[in-house]
Protein backbone atom coordinates (compact mmCIF):
# COMPACT_ATOMS: atom_id res chain seq x y z
CA UNK A 1 0.00 0.00 0.00
CA UNK A 2 1.07 3.59 -0.65
CA UNK A 3 0.71 5.02 2.84
CA UNK A 4 -2.60 6.78 2.21
CA UNK A 5 -4.36 4.35 4.54
CA UNK A 6 -4.12 4.01 8.32
CA UNK A 7 -5.13 0.72 9.91
CA UNK A 8 -7.48 1.18 12.87
CA UNK A 9 -8.09 -2.48 13.69
CA UNK A 10 -7.56 -5.97 12.32
CA UNK A 11 -9.32 -9.16 13.44
CA UNK A 12 -8.91 -12.70 12.14
CA UNK A 13 -12.26 -14.05 10.98
CA UNK A 14 -12.94 -17.29 9.06
CA UNK A 15 -9.27 -17.49 8.17
CA UNK A 16 -9.21 -14.02 6.64
CA UNK A 17 -8.98 -10.58 8.20
CA UNK A 18 -11.63 -7.99 8.91
CA UNK A 19 -9.82 -4.67 8.87
CA UNK A 20 -11.00 -1.15 9.61
CA UNK A 21 -9.02 1.52 7.80
CA UNK A 22 -8.96 5.32 7.71
CA UNK A 23 -7.92 7.86 5.10
CA UNK A 24 -8.31 11.55 4.44
CA UNK A 25 -10.86 12.36 1.75
CA UNK A 26 -10.05 15.32 -0.46
CA UNK A 27 -13.61 15.19 -1.81
CA UNK A 28 -15.34 15.32 1.58
CA UNK A 29 -12.67 17.36 3.38
CA UNK A 30 -12.49 15.02 6.37
CA UNK A 31 -11.15 11.69 7.58
CA UNK A 32 -13.20 8.67 6.57
CA UNK A 33 -13.23 5.12 7.91
CA UNK A 34 -14.13 1.98 6.00
CA UNK A 35 -14.20 -1.75 6.55
CA UNK A 36 -12.48 -4.25 4.29
CA UNK A 37 -12.64 -8.03 4.61
CA UNK A 38 -9.77 -9.94 2.99
CA UNK A 39 -10.51 -13.68 2.67
CA UNK A 40 -7.85 -16.23 3.57
CA UNK A 41 -6.71 -16.68 -0.02
CA UNK A 42 -5.70 -13.00 -0.10
CA UNK A 43 -3.57 -13.15 3.04
CA UNK A 44 -1.84 -16.49 2.48
CA UNK A 45 1.84 -16.91 1.59
CA UNK A 46 0.82 -17.08 -2.06
CA UNK A 47 -2.08 -14.61 -2.31
CA UNK A 48 -4.42 -14.58 -5.28
CA UNK A 49 -6.65 -11.95 -6.86
CA UNK A 50 -10.38 -12.25 -6.25
CA UNK A 51 -13.65 -10.42 -7.03
CA UNK A 52 -14.75 -7.46 -4.92
CA UNK A 53 -18.08 -6.26 -3.55
CA UNK A 54 -18.83 -2.75 -2.31
CA UNK A 55 -21.52 -2.55 0.39
CA UNK A 56 -23.44 0.67 1.16
CA UNK A 57 -25.17 0.92 4.53
CA UNK A 58 -28.37 2.67 5.52
CA UNK A 59 -29.43 5.61 7.67
CA UNK A 60 -27.86 5.94 11.15
CA UNK A 61 -25.05 3.51 10.28
CA UNK A 62 -21.28 3.88 10.44
CA UNK A 63 -18.78 1.55 8.80
CA UNK A 64 -19.19 -0.71 11.85
CA UNK A 65 -22.82 -1.89 11.60
CA UNK A 66 -22.43 -4.09 8.55
CA UNK A 67 -19.18 -5.57 9.86
CA UNK A 68 -20.58 -6.72 13.20
CA UNK A 69 -24.23 -7.49 12.35
CA UNK A 70 -24.48 -9.01 8.87
CA UNK A 71 -22.39 -12.17 9.25
CA UNK A 72 -21.00 -11.51 5.80
CA UNK A 73 -17.44 -12.66 6.60
CA UNK A 74 -18.47 -16.32 6.55
CA UNK A 75 -19.73 -15.98 2.99
CA UNK A 76 -16.97 -13.68 1.79
CA UNK A 77 -14.62 -16.44 2.88
CA UNK A 78 -16.74 -19.16 1.29
CA UNK A 79 -17.09 -17.39 -2.07
CA UNK A 80 -13.56 -15.90 -1.99
CA UNK A 81 -14.44 -12.24 -2.37
CA UNK A 82 -13.14 -9.00 -0.87
CA UNK A 83 -15.91 -6.93 0.74
CA UNK A 84 -15.48 -3.19 1.30
CA UNK A 85 -17.92 -0.93 3.15
CA UNK A 86 -17.46 2.85 3.49
CA UNK A 87 -19.05 5.11 6.07
CA UNK A 88 -22.40 6.71 5.23
CA UNK A 89 -21.52 10.41 5.52
CA UNK A 90 -18.69 12.84 6.19
CA UNK A 91 -17.96 13.34 9.88
CA UNK A 92 -16.06 15.73 12.11
CA UNK A 93 -16.27 18.96 14.07
CA UNK A 94 -16.03 21.05 10.92
CA UNK A 95 -18.78 19.19 9.06
CA UNK A 96 -22.10 21.12 9.04
CA UNK A 97 -25.13 19.32 10.42
CA UNK A 98 -28.74 20.12 11.19
CA UNK A 99 -31.82 21.68 9.65
CA UNK A 100 -35.04 22.92 11.19
CA UNK A 101 -36.71 19.52 11.45
CA UNK A 102 -33.62 17.56 12.55
CA UNK A 103 -30.72 19.08 14.52
CA UNK A 104 -28.51 16.10 13.59
CA UNK A 105 -29.43 16.04 9.91
CA UNK A 106 -26.57 14.85 7.73
CA UNK A 107 -24.86 12.59 10.26
CA UNK A 108 -24.96 9.02 8.91
CA UNK A 109 -27.33 10.23 6.21
CA UNK A 110 -25.27 11.28 3.20
CA UNK A 111 -27.72 9.64 0.77
CA UNK A 112 -24.91 8.87 -1.69
CA UNK A 113 -25.48 12.12 -3.58
CA UNK A 114 -23.65 15.39 -4.22
CA UNK A 115 -25.41 18.16 -2.31
CA UNK A 116 -26.00 21.50 -4.04
CA UNK A 117 -27.54 23.51 -1.19
CA UNK A 118 -24.89 25.95 0.14
CA UNK A 119 -24.79 24.65 3.72
CA UNK A 120 -24.00 21.09 2.63
CA UNK A 121 -22.37 21.44 -0.79
CA UNK A 122 -18.75 21.61 0.41
CA UNK A 123 -18.73 18.34 2.33
CA UNK A 124 -21.72 16.22 1.39
CA UNK A 125 -20.47 14.74 -1.87
CA UNK A 126 -20.87 11.05 -1.17
CA UNK A 127 -21.56 10.23 -4.82
CA UNK A 128 -18.32 11.81 -6.03
CA UNK A 129 -16.48 10.41 -3.03
CA UNK A 130 -17.47 6.86 -3.88
CA UNK A 131 -17.12 6.95 -7.65
CA UNK A 132 -14.20 9.33 -8.10
CA UNK A 133 -12.16 8.79 -4.94
CA UNK A 134 -13.05 5.76 -2.82
CA UNK A 135 -13.40 3.05 -5.47
CA UNK A 136 -10.22 4.21 -7.29
CA UNK A 137 -8.42 4.32 -3.92
CA UNK A 138 -9.39 0.73 -3.13
CA UNK A 139 -8.43 -0.44 -6.61
CA UNK A 140 -5.03 1.22 -6.27
CA UNK A 141 -4.22 0.27 -2.68
CA UNK A 142 -5.28 -3.37 -3.11
CA UNK A 143 -4.56 -3.73 -6.82
CA UNK A 144 -2.60 -6.96 -6.42
CA UNK A 145 -5.59 -8.65 -4.78
CA UNK A 146 -8.55 -7.44 -6.86
CA UNK A 147 -10.04 -8.62 -10.15
CA UNK A 148 -11.50 -5.27 -11.22
CA UNK A 149 -13.61 -6.86 -13.95
CA UNK A 150 -15.45 -8.82 -11.24
CA UNK A 151 -16.83 -5.97 -9.16
CA UNK A 152 -20.32 -5.66 -7.73
CA UNK A 153 -22.27 -3.30 -5.49
CA UNK A 154 -25.00 -3.99 -2.93
CA UNK A 155 -26.67 -2.17 -0.07
CA UNK A 156 -29.57 -1.76 2.35
CA UNK A 157 -32.27 0.93 2.63
CA UNK A 158 -30.48 4.25 1.97
CA UNK A 159 -27.54 2.09 0.91
CA UNK A 160 -29.81 0.16 -1.44
CA UNK A 161 -30.77 3.50 -2.94
CA UNK A 162 -27.06 4.22 -3.34
CA UNK A 163 -26.30 0.82 -4.86
CA UNK A 164 -29.09 1.25 -7.42
CA UNK A 165 -28.36 4.84 -8.41
CA UNK A 166 -24.60 4.37 -8.59
CA UNK A 167 -24.75 0.91 -10.13
CA UNK A 168 -27.16 1.95 -12.88
CA UNK A 169 -25.07 5.02 -13.69
CA UNK A 170 -21.80 3.11 -13.76
CA UNK A 171 -22.15 -0.32 -15.39
CA UNK A 172 -18.53 0.05 -16.49
CA UNK A 173 -17.52 -0.21 -12.81
CA UNK A 174 -20.13 -2.53 -11.32
CA UNK A 175 -21.02 -5.72 -13.16
CA UNK A 176 -23.66 -6.80 -10.65
CA UNK A 177 -26.19 -5.11 -8.34
CA UNK A 178 -28.27 -6.39 -5.44
CA UNK A 179 -30.30 -4.60 -2.78
CA UNK A 180 -32.09 -5.13 0.52
CA UNK A 181 -35.25 -3.04 1.05
CA UNK A 182 -33.99 0.02 -0.87
CA UNK A 183 -35.41 3.53 -0.99
CA UNK A 184 -36.75 3.38 -4.53
CA UNK A 185 -38.48 6.62 -5.46
CA UNK A 186 -37.37 9.57 -3.27
CA UNK A 187 -38.86 12.08 -5.72
CA UNK A 188 -42.24 11.10 -4.29
CA UNK A 189 -43.19 12.62 -0.92
CA UNK A 190 -43.29 10.10 1.94
CA UNK A 191 -43.66 10.49 5.73
CA UNK A 192 -40.19 9.71 7.08
CA UNK A 193 -37.23 9.74 4.71
CA UNK A 194 -36.26 10.10 1.10
CA UNK A 195 -37.98 13.17 -0.31
CA UNK A 196 -37.25 15.52 2.56
CA UNK A 197 -33.60 14.46 2.67
CA UNK A 198 -33.14 15.14 -1.03
CA UNK A 199 -34.92 18.46 -0.64
CA UNK A 200 -32.50 19.49 2.13
CA UNK A 201 -29.48 18.50 0.07
CA UNK A 202 -30.63 19.55 -3.41
CA UNK A 203 -33.23 22.27 -2.90
CA UNK A 204 -36.88 22.35 -4.05
CA UNK A 205 -38.15 19.85 -6.60
CA UNK A 206 -39.04 22.42 -9.26
CA UNK A 207 -37.85 23.93 -12.51
CA UNK A 208 -34.39 23.00 -13.72
CA UNK A 209 -33.65 21.50 -10.31
CA UNK A 210 -35.78 18.50 -11.25
CA UNK A 211 -32.83 17.26 -13.31
CA UNK A 212 -30.66 17.23 -10.18
CA UNK A 213 -33.22 15.13 -8.32
CA UNK A 214 -33.53 12.66 -11.19
CA UNK A 215 -29.85 11.78 -10.83
CA UNK A 216 -30.64 10.19 -7.46
CA UNK A 217 -34.04 8.62 -8.09
CA UNK A 218 -33.83 4.91 -8.87
CA UNK A 219 -37.23 4.78 -10.56
CA UNK A 220 -36.23 7.56 -12.96
CA UNK A 221 -32.80 6.07 -13.64
CA UNK A 222 -34.26 2.62 -14.26
CA UNK A 223 -36.79 3.98 -16.75
CA UNK A 224 -34.01 5.77 -18.67
CA UNK A 225 -31.31 3.10 -18.37
CA UNK A 226 -29.65 2.28 -21.70
CA UNK A 227 -26.61 0.34 -20.51
CA UNK A 228 -25.86 -3.35 -20.93
CA UNK A 229 -28.56 -5.75 -19.80
CA UNK A 230 -28.50 -6.15 -16.03
CA UNK A 231 -30.27 -8.45 -13.60
CA UNK A 232 -30.86 -6.91 -10.18
CA UNK A 233 -31.55 -8.99 -7.08
CA UNK A 234 -34.16 -7.08 -5.08
CA UNK A 235 -34.88 -8.43 -1.60
CA UNK A 236 -37.88 -6.72 -0.03
CA UNK A 237 -39.56 -7.37 3.29
CA UNK A 238 -43.32 -7.33 3.53
CA UNK A 239 -45.91 -5.75 5.78
CA UNK A 240 -43.70 -5.92 8.90
CA UNK A 241 -41.33 -3.34 7.47
CA UNK A 242 -42.32 -0.14 9.32
CA UNK A 243 -40.81 1.95 6.52
CA UNK A 244 -42.58 0.32 3.59
CA UNK A 245 -44.48 3.54 2.88
CA UNK A 246 -41.13 5.33 2.45
CA UNK A 247 -39.40 2.68 0.34
CA UNK A 248 -42.02 2.40 -2.45
CA UNK A 249 -40.69 -0.85 -3.95
CA UNK A 250 -43.70 -1.34 -6.21
CA UNK A 251 -42.98 1.95 -7.93
CA UNK A 252 -39.57 0.67 -8.97
CA UNK A 253 -40.37 -2.89 -10.01
CA UNK A 254 -43.25 -1.56 -12.11
CA UNK A 255 -40.64 0.01 -14.41
CA UNK A 256 -40.46 -1.98 -17.62
CA UNK A 257 -37.08 -1.68 -19.31
CA UNK A 258 -35.79 -4.41 -21.66
CA UNK A 259 -32.29 -3.88 -20.29
CA UNK A 260 -33.26 -4.53 -16.65
CA UNK A 261 -34.41 -7.84 -15.17
CA UNK A 262 -35.89 -7.57 -11.67
CA UNK A 263 -35.14 -10.64 -9.57
CA UNK A 264 -37.67 -9.65 -6.92
CA UNK A 265 -37.96 -11.61 -3.67
CA UNK A 266 -40.68 -10.72 -1.15
CA UNK A 267 -39.71 -11.87 2.35
CA UNK A 268 -42.74 -11.84 4.61
CA UNK A 269 -42.39 -11.86 8.41
CA UNK A 270 -39.03 -10.05 8.36
CA UNK A 271 -38.56 -6.45 9.42
CA UNK A 272 -36.21 -3.75 8.14
CA UNK A 273 -33.17 -4.61 10.26
CA UNK A 274 -30.04 -6.73 10.14
CA UNK A 275 -31.79 -10.00 11.06
CA UNK A 276 -33.33 -9.74 7.59
CA UNK A 277 -29.96 -9.02 6.00
CA UNK A 278 -28.09 -11.77 7.83
CA UNK A 279 -30.76 -14.32 6.84
CA UNK A 280 -30.46 -13.76 3.10
CA UNK A 281 -26.99 -12.33 2.54
CA UNK A 282 -25.57 -15.68 1.40
CA UNK A 283 -28.03 -15.60 -1.50
CA UNK A 284 -26.65 -12.21 -2.48
CA UNK A 285 -23.09 -13.49 -2.57
CA UNK A 286 -24.23 -16.45 -4.67
CA UNK A 287 -26.11 -14.09 -7.01
CA UNK A 288 -23.08 -11.88 -7.64
CA UNK A 289 -20.87 -14.87 -8.51
CA UNK A 290 -22.95 -15.42 -11.66
CA UNK A 291 -21.42 -12.30 -13.16
CA UNK A 292 -17.78 -12.86 -12.19
CA UNK A 293 -14.92 -14.65 -13.87
CA UNK A 294 -14.50 -18.07 -12.31
CA UNK A 295 -10.73 -18.27 -12.02
CA UNK A 296 -8.43 -16.61 -9.51
CA UNK A 297 -5.23 -15.09 -10.83
CA UNK A 298 -2.09 -16.27 -9.10
CA UNK A 299 0.50 -13.74 -8.08
Which residues fall in each region the model found?
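Non-catalytic cap/lid and distal C-terminal segments of serine-dependent acyl enzymes
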Residues: 2-299
